[in-house]
Amino acid sequence: MDAERILLNALAGLWHDMGKFALRSGEGMREVWDEHAKHDVAYRHALASDSFVQEYAPERWRGRLAGVRYHHRPANLRSISDEAYSQACVVQVADWLSSGERDENAEGGPARLRSPFSRLRGHDAPFYLPLKPLSDCSEHLFPSPCVDEKGVPVEEYRELWSQFAAQARQTLSEGSLHRMDLRTFVETAYFLLQEYAWCVPSAYYNQVPDVSLFDHARATAAIAACLTADDREVPWLERLMRAIRSPRDDGNDAEALDTPVATLVGGDLTGLQRFLYSISSENAAKSLRGRSVYLQLLSELAAEFVVDGLGLPITNLLYAGGGNFYLLVQTTWEGDRVEKRLHAIQRQVVEMLAEAHGGDLGLALASTPITPREFFRGHFHEAWARLHQEIRRAKQTPLGALAPSRLAEVIGDGIGTGGETAVCPVCGRESEGGTEDRVCSICASLESLGMQVARANYMVLADIDIAPTAPQSARSWQSILSVFGRSVHFAKDAEDLAAIAEDLSARAKRLRVLCLAEGRGMSADGLNAFDFQLPTSVGYRPFARLVPWRDREESQIKTFDDLAEQAKGIERWGVLRMDVDNLGRLMREGFRKRDAHGISDSLTISRLASVSFALRVFFDKCVAWAALQADAASGVHGSGSCPDTGRSSRLYLQYAGGDDLFLVGAWDALPLTAAEIQAAFQEFVCHNPAVTISAGIALLPPKFPIYQAAHLALDALGAAKARTGGVFYLASSENGGKNAINFLGVSLDWDSFRTVHEQARKMAQWLEDGAVPRSLPQRILRLYHEWYEGRRRSVRQGRLRPRQRYFGPWVWHAAYQISRAASEIEDTEVKQEIRRWVSELPSDERNIMRLAMAARWAELCTRKRKDGNAERSGI
């Protein structure tokens, strides 16, 4: 395997369409576009892409990237250079397979990128992404409706290109090469495209422009790397190209279409929930965030470990998040099937996890070969479904990769020696070499990680020699992760960064430095000009963060009990869990469309990459922003929230990534935060009714165990998705349920939830002002229980069908009781509003459930503390 050739061909795949970006900005080319040039390279963008190579590729590699210029005309290189011709063939094939078709379309002017969510499940809404760098503030990255997708002022493209070109000159120039080898150069080129081409369409002529240049380019690079790693010979590539041009021919070339050219790989870390939440409540605020970041790093480094172990670049990591990852790798390894190598790598990872965590964590790894035919539209979903079937099978035996003798050791391992050995108060394991308060060294390091991440503006990943195994005596999360050949560090500022780089200079082989600060990007604090002494790649990484600091010096984070004390009304903290509904089905079936010719499926690897990356943008960037808006709007205890810094007053984001989130906060802040996140999500997915999100909220007293809180919130989320525990058993719902929130034990669709919130807000304000008797909420709740018991009794006795409307004494009791309460009210507007609520009760019996929930909510928000503190009312 030629490692340099793999990287060069991946780079050629990454840059093959750079000319499209340049031309849309009005950028000139080094050569004149005429008939000779057209005959030579076929399309203007190919010539412009070559101009980009000539300007930004270092001289030592520039001459080995001819495939960029000739990816539409490989034959023009046949008699010039075998290596160049092979590369051009590889890039052309990879380009076709990435787009899911033989793409030979004409060119046009500037166009906008359509959000991939605007077309899922038959939705057809013209929403387009702004031409903004990925590191820009979250509120600037939402799609918006546009009448004319091609009506983009050249100035917008020119501004984006200007920023991109400036970064390219700083990070890819000859002057920076003292800190770059080919691998770090490819990584930096990758991060540059991610930063600036995530919002640029790949193609648009005769096509819907819903795949970004970044996603198409990275998929092309991944396929090119696979073809090169498998050492595909030119004659075979020529046969495949002929077969792709004429896929219906039954000649000898057709066989190439059904020969696997790559392998889809899926990984799933198992045991995450138990590892995250099986900790004491006392230390939860310190430990939970560190544990979630550790698992995030573990998932990503495990994915990169597989990619590195197969000699592939970062482009072949299609997605990593939420404990899952997806890769595209070659079909062979050292003359054998790649599955054998994958199994060996999996065994290494599972061995390490068993050593470090005693079998609590495992890795399910599965793969399936994919043929050229399956890359094409109408077929890719078959390979994707096949992979997930294999993943489900692999998850049944997450430790199955262990040797039988080692598996017996892990399963039969005792829980400790007993006796006088100290037990860690966080994880409950026997503690050796821990802190004075008996916290074991690993838990102490995870607490430290949570604090580091809360302050960090940079993340540094250093390539180091791979540790042979993670010893059971590992003292920190860093020592565990070192078995992946990575040393991970977080830095607050340039001074910290310099100290980390100095410390790593003697033991690391190369560095990757990622800026985590929103709105600053790759150029923050002169990052590009920093002399790291080692080969270094640089980039920007979206990173969700929301921290309730106790002080402006950021020395301590509020505990969960602190958050409960800050709550309005009753002293409670809470957990909010949210995740996307039916995501697996959306990915499998979202691009299917029925027309006069039947059912078509436009899913391709590039579209899959686009949807996955878009979800990452929302959860890694927009969730924290939306939550901060809700926190800042609450106006509680001064101006503690700061959207620019991730400083929150009453919310602590423990995890956001993949397709879900876990957030802790003062109980009363959580429902409004959930509503704000849901509204932001709907805007982000172009108000597509098929792409929804659900939420579950659990309210807890101080000192309540976090593992129980997590399960209660998960149960609430499950109830929301099933639409149980509330109004939904009375009526069927669209979308198979889901698209709902469960709060105070009641499941509501989001519109009903907002109606309830408005009623609760008014009621709480009236109670605070003394405009209504304090007995009003209890009167409403008694009516609700009368309705509930009467309905249940009638159903049990067979006098009422489950979905039939129930009328009974509760109706006139409601009219009497609440009207009597209203008669005691002096404010005319308040009196009229309450009477309106009563008049609406018989028209839809779900109204009594909504009103009861509002009454309960208002009562909790205005309840006095036992210590005699003043009420903290309002919603």
Where are these regions (language model features)?
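Charged, helix-rich terminal subdomains or tails
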Residues: M1-G323, L328-I875
